């Protein structure tokens, strides 16, 4: 048995959708116990709602200390200028105690993202890896593990580094079936590796 956490931040719901799909892929692996949680919102409620934020997200809010309870953590964040969202950064900045005790060392880590126009998705994932590397986590990219990576018949997120979706400049585009297939593959791939390492 391997415990897998899908931990995300989503403002408009794109990453929430991706997170639930990643979890679906992980749950399809025998021996994977999968939980979906989100990081706390740091914006004031009124500002969040005025910006069009999606308030009705069902996942419970995580506490940084509980990351040590999992064998694998799959992180999801929208890109902010080629970096993770500030809400995710604030959450991870509270894991210094875990780092000092090596609590995440050897655990599996992977990242997925969303972008407005496609710019920054790979940079967001690889810059996120820096934090995971400092924790000593085993970084899991996707490579080109499923055919959807090679289909260029439509706008498509998804990179060898991690799943992604392109939301459009106004956020109106929702994750496509191909993007969701890549997200599902990421969950499955990480869960399988977590079981090999920790199961």
Swiss-Prot record:
Its cofactor is FMN. It catalyses: a quinone + NADH + H(+) = a quinol + NAD(+); a quinone + NADPH + H(+) = a quinol + NADP(+). Gene3D superfamilies: 3.40.50.360. Disulfide bonds: none annotated. Substrate binds at residue 99. Binds 1 FMN per monomer. Residues 4-190 form the Flavodoxin-like domain. PROSITE patterns: FLAVODOXIN_LIKE. GO terms for cellular component: membrane. Its EC number is 1.6.5.2. Pfam families: FMN_red. It comes from the Bacteria. Keywords: Flavoprotein, FMN, NAD, NADP, Nucleotide-binding, Oxidoreductase. NAD(+) binds at residue 12. One of its GO terms (molecular function) is NAD binding. FMN binds at residues 10-15, 79-81, 114-119, 134. Belongs to the WrbA family. This is NAD(P)H dehydrogenase (quinone). It comes from Marinobacter nauticus (strain ATCC 700491 / DSM 11845 / VT8).
